[in-house]
């Protein structure tokens, strides 16, 4: 039924259509009836106040909206500019304060660093002076003994002698060293340790006499007798056994004759000749 009503409404000719009042009045006389399904169709006329009221209002709003913005825009930049200036001034003031605080902190840190550097330099100077003061003593030799680490032929200053002495000629240290216990024994000469014998010169004299004995046999009997008498008169001279055995008979005869003894003893002899057991050949020939 509803579809039929819609079809009837659409098939309405344009010449026969009248006002709604007229259609309503002539509804009983064969006119078309109003459809309930489309109530806004009859309201869409040229004289309807809905479109007339809304259209100019929409246009007025569209025209007045930019005008309102145009009135508000010139005032807003002034306010923003003043607030911006105030904000910039505040930022500049804060920047100045921050800069001053940062500068003060930098100055304080620089002063602390310089003070710490000065303290460190002063401490290092004191340490250098303290460490250098005992090292200066090492240049003065305390002990006169030569150092085993020093080379041969170097000179050392001796405080006792007040002169430079070679390291080889220095006496050994009186304090024994554990590393050099046997150096004095090794360096000591064996000649100094052995005492000279008392019989040394006597043995040497006897050896010299025995060496010269073969020459006496060719000098004659008188030379041998005089030498034997001189040896017997001298208690420090030892007579060899060979001469005593070979000339025992001649020595006995010479001792028994007092004339020969007196002649040998009374003859004038120089001190040098008396000291020597030998008599020159000239004196024997003159006798």
Swiss-Prot record:
Sorted UniProt keywords: Cytoplasm, Isopeptide bond, Nucleus, Phosphoprotein, Protein phosphatase inhibitor, Ubl conjugation
Gene that produces this protein: PABIR1
Family to which this protein belongs: Belongs to the FAM122 family.
Organism per entry: Homo sapiens (Human)
Composition-biased stretches (Low complexity): 178-189, 246-257
Subcellular location: Nucleus; Cytoplasm
Residues bearing the modification Phosphoserine: 35, 37, 45, 48, 62, 76, 143, 147, 187, 189, 267, 270, 276
One BP annotation, GO: mitotic G2/M transition checkpoint
Protein name from the UniProt record: PPP2R1A-PPP2R2A-interacting phosphatase regulator 1
Organism phylogeny: Eukaryota, Metazoa, Chordata, Craniata, Vertebrata
UniProt biased composition (Polar residues): 259-270
Documented effect of changing residue 107 to G: Reduces the inhibition of PP2A activity by PABIR1/FAM122A
Gly residues bias locations: 15-32
């Amino acid at each position: 039924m509803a579809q039929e009503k819609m079809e009837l409404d659409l098939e309405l000719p344009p010449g026969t259509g009248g006002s709604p009042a007229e259609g309503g009045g002539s509804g009983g006389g064969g006119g078309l009836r109003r459809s309930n399904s489309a109530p806004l169709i009859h309201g869409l006329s040229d004289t309807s106040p809905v479109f007339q009221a809304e259209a100019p209002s929409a246009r007025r709003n569209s025209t007045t909206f930019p005008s309102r913005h145009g009135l508000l825009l010139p005032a807003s930049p002034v306010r923003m500019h003043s607030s911006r200036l105030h904000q910039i001034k505040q930022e500049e003031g804060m920047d100045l304060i921050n800069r001053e605080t940062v500068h003060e902190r930098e100055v304080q840190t620089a002063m602390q660093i310089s003070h710490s550097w000065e303290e460190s330099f002063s401490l290092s100077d004191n340490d250098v002076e303290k460490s250098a003061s005992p090292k200066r003593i090492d240049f003065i030799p305390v002990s006169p003994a030569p150092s085993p680490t020093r080379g041969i032929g170097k000179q050392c200053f001796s405080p006792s002698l007040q002169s430079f002495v070679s390291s080889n000629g220095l006496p050994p240290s009186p304090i024994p060293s554990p590393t050099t216990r046997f150096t004095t024994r090794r360096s000591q000469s064996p000649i100094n340790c052995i005492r000279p014998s008392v019989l040394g010169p006597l043995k040497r004299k006897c050896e010299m006499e025995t060496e010269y004995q073969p020459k006496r046999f060719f000098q004659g009997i008188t030379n041998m007798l005089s030498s034997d008498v001189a040896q017997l008169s001298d208690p420090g001279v030892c007579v060899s056994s060979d001469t005593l055995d070979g000339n025992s008979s001649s020595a006995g005869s010479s001792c028994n004759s007092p004339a020969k003894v007196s002649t040998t003893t009374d003859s004038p002899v120089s001190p040098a000749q008396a000291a020597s057991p030998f008599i020159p050949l000239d004196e024997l020939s003159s006798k």
